């Protein structure tokens, strides 16, 4: 949908700055669902992981990095059948940590302090969206 989004944006005279957000919001990350599905359905096949990656480029600013994180976290959160505080926290951490592992933010002027703050905000937002109550320890 990245390429079609760029085409649609250009057709509608959207500024290049906005198109850059469309272009970078998946970076060069792997489309895990299709990759895992392929491995499951064709276990004997030799697979080139590059065939299951978005073309990029990777985010180049804090803002494009935040969009990438938000898009991935939001999409992943829809897969949770019964969101809990723990599952939402784990989802935010694992999603963003995977992006860091894949070096999606190496061209951004973003710090680990920034990323930690962003994670906290996303966790709070998801708790609110899914109406999850804070789990207090039992006395």
Region locations from a protein language model:
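Terminal helices and disordered tails flanking the catalytic cores of nucleotide-processing hydrolases
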Residues: 2-7, 13-139
């Amino acid at each position: 949908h990245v390429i079609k989004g760029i085409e649609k944006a250009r057709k509608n005279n959207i500024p290049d700055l906005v198109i850059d957000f469309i272009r970078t919001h998946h970076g060069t990350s792997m489309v895990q669902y299709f990759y895992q599905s392929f491995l499951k359905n064709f276990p004997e096949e030799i697979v080139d992981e590059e065939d299951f990656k978005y073309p990029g480029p990777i985010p180049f600013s804090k803002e494009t990095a935040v969009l990438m994180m938000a898009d991935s976290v939001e999409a992943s959160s829809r897969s949770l059948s019964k969101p809990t505080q723990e599952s939402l926290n784990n989802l935010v951490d694992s999603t963003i940590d995977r992006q860091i592992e894949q070096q999606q933010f190496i061209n951004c002027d973003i710090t680990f302090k920034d990323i930690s703050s962003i994670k906290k905000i996303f966790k709070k937002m998801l708790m609110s969206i899914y109406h999850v109550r804070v789990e207090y320890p039992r006395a």
